[in-house]
Amino acid sequence: MRINRFGYTLTFLLTLASSSDIYAQRAERSLQYFPEGRGFASYNGKNRYTRALYGGHSDFRLETSDRPVFATFTKKEKRNIRFFLHLADGKRLNFDELELCTAYYFPGQRKYYIRNSSLGIDIDMTAMCCYDNDEAIWRIVCNKMPEGSHISCVVSMIEAKHLYRNGDMGVETTPNFFEASKEHEPLMTTEIKPEKEIYIRYNDGSVAKMPLNDGKTLFAVTQLQSNHLANQVVINTPDKFLNTLGGVLTSAADGIWDEKVWLHGAVGWRVQLPGWRAGYSGDFLGWHDRARTHFSNYAESMVTNIEQKFSHPMQDAALNSARAEKKWGSPMYSNGYICRYPNKADNMNHYDMNLCYIDELLWHLNWTGDLNFAREMWQKLKLHLAWEKRNFDPDNNHLYDAYACIWASDGLYYDSGDVTHSTAYNYRANKMAAEIAELIGEDATPYRTEAEEILKAINSKLWMNDRGVWAEYNDNMGLKRQHDAPAVWTVYHAIDSDIATPHQAYRATEYVTNNIPHVPIKSSGITKDDEMINAGDYATISSSNWMPYDWSVNNVAFAEVMHTALAFFQAGNKEAGFKLMKSCILDGMYMGCSPGNIGQISHYDAARGECYRDFGDPVGVASRLVVQGLFGIKPDALHRRLTINPGFPKDWANADITTPDIFYSFKREGTSDKYEIKHNFANVDTVTLRIPARYTKFDIKNGCQILDYRCDNESFDMPHVIFKLLAKAGQKVSIELKGNGSKISKSKAKVVRVNTGLALLQQENRAWWISTALDESERDKSSLIAGQFSDINVDALEPIDISKHFNAKVTDIFRNRYESPRSPYTTLTIPIHGYSEWCHPKDTVNIDDSGLRKAINDSIFTAPNGIKWLSPKEGNNIVYTSLFDNYPDEALISVGGSASHAYLMMAGSTNPMQCNINNAVVEFLYTDGTIQ
């Protein structure tokens, strides 16, 4: 018998085990909020302090609830604010306990309609944050009040003495943390005489009734500012659940802006970071001035005066060598590194946020075509690319290590491997650097060459044609094997960074559909909207299929789901992309506990559950998903062109979007599809419009000059045509297609070619590709044979003495130091003791085999099923194999004799980075030369 060690972690004997379903359904839930126009409605809702309103760009916010109870927050001061109705008989009623309350969240505003028929109460209330000062304002309209009643407003300290994450949802340790403190008396009570219209202002810890005219003025100004912000992006579609998104995006994005940079989060994690994807928000929502401010401030955070003076590897011994040592002059902390805080190039962080920052900067140039800013940023771009190369491609094979360069990095370590997502980032950066260099008169050759070599290496080393997807990574250590079960970030970064051919991109989305766990979204509600959800086959996804669970490695995270949906749109898999997008919106914004929330983690994440609100990373991705994915707006102003490739579902008859940069609309009437476009890009002269061809023939009615027209030979799911239109800023252009041939139908088409995973259909003069991949539910399983386990005849068992091969105690595994072999380069890797990951490099676990030892009698351990093994009560009791030098790579054990079965007691140690890779293999060598 031979035991071979394949993986780079540890294996010691082995055992059979099954994994629990980390994505098991949580408790049933239903829609908590319903779309009404641009707002979210709740009826006698139960959520408290879950919808934050933001005003100016400080940390001040007003927490609102499904009923009229509130809290305010700044780092220095937190207050609970309640309203009461005092009846003539002395009874006091809390506003949030009155009989009927319909609440609306319109981005930036919370409105309440409070009714109690038995008491004759009819009150309307609106709450907002002010935009010019750290204040809040309420308007109360008393349509009907009980005789002799009046209102009071009570300000109290909050229950929590300390807030762990600024009072964010799902992460605080104190129950009811924003409720009024039970330990302290109210700080103030303001009695308010009943009037038709009342205005109340919160300022500096206290509330006061405002004079009517002053209140009207402040309220009107605040509401005007709120509406202006919410209406910066407006979308109209046939789907009412999507028509709220414009204001949701702009209000959330405004909440993560601090007038210097885009923040990590609006509530929890309200800190400055150069990553992650929050920085996309500015350009995709029309704030190009804010975007430039963000990029300029972090450009000043790049190290430019510290040359590398230490060579690879530079691992931090104090942190068990799991990550880079924070030392100036090391490969990582030297010229080109972007520090954590804006305008400060003197502080170290433990992430490579360069890649994401640079990608956002390049998108900014795509949106603006600002060559002056490109010249200003050129030296920083050069330093960045040189820094990436010397740190993460030191062997110059044009494939890059990934060193904590994406949001999901906390549980990831690639040990200097060749990684798809980081390599894709570097491909796009080099490709665009070459384009920019040509435009500003710099040398493009080194960047064009590197981009070309990267693409060659990706296609030859990382693309797996048999699987239709890229490898997660190729191992640089051990047996240099390939991880062939990639996470979603591998797929969406590859597609987003343009390393994919159209066929590769589409097939990669099919990999996600068929291999990544899908979590159904179901509702226990009884409304028609709840029924729509249950009939719609909606589902969200986890970020990988890796086990065991570890934070960031296999979460149900909104940004990961949304970026995957964006990749589906980009790949032409539009129907699936839309379904995934809407699933995410239903999950977080309507079924979640905060209306219109762009959160971090989903309710369906079994480890964390729903948490965080208006988190920067998903805010940026959601902005791209709506603008670039659903509406297909993709400017390349550096080359004076704009592409529009709508991602609308096939059954939509209309849609339009308005942003500061563009208005365009789609309208279908009968056989006619009409598109109207008016953009405001100063550096764009042409629009390339890619649209479905629903008929084999059509008449074209154009309201502009058509520069080019062709059929798209790389269409998926249905044929498309491409128009190139002359369209300068401010000029309205239109195209109308009126079908006069046969309607496109898969049933009428014939297969004319088959490629791996795809088939080309043709109907008359139109052709398009469809997937031939089968998901697991469609596979023919009739030939599969169920596994069997024979009863064990205990009397026939013969324990084999292999004690001379034992080379360790089971308990030694995480007490050792696995020092060699280790990567010759600075990297993220498994800690020196073989447990945990770089974020928690000192975590460990005590392996206790005392129970096993205690159960041994006369050197025999008997399992509950009667199988017996020889095992000592003391001393070494296991055969360890490992690719680390601590133990041999393999163990050859002579068994002798003959038998029909062999039973082994086995144990193993692994980690998510080795999931779906064979960690070890046991072979039986027979005297006739055969191997089993």
Report residues per predicted region.
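Bacterial Sec-dependent N-terminal signal peptides
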Residues: 1-25, 140
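N-terminal/edge-of-domain interface segments
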Residues: 772-932
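An extended acidic
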Residues: 26-114, 208-233, 387, 629-639, ...
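Acidic/polar, glycine-enriched structural segments that form the non-catalytic walls/loops
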Residues: 23-32, 119-124, 128-137, 141-271, ...
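Acidic, contiguous internal or C-terminal segments within carbohydrate-active enzymes
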Residues: 116-159, 662-683, 885-903, 911-913
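Non-catalytic C-terminal accessory modules of carbohydrate-active enzymes
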Residues: 74-81, 86-128, 132-133, 563-758, ...
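Active-site core of glycosidic bond-cleaving carbohydrate-active enzymes
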Residues: 271-303, 379-382, 386, 413, ...
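Acidic/His metal-coordination segments adjacent to aromatic residues that form catalytic metal sites
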Residues: 257, 327-347, 402-419, 477, ...
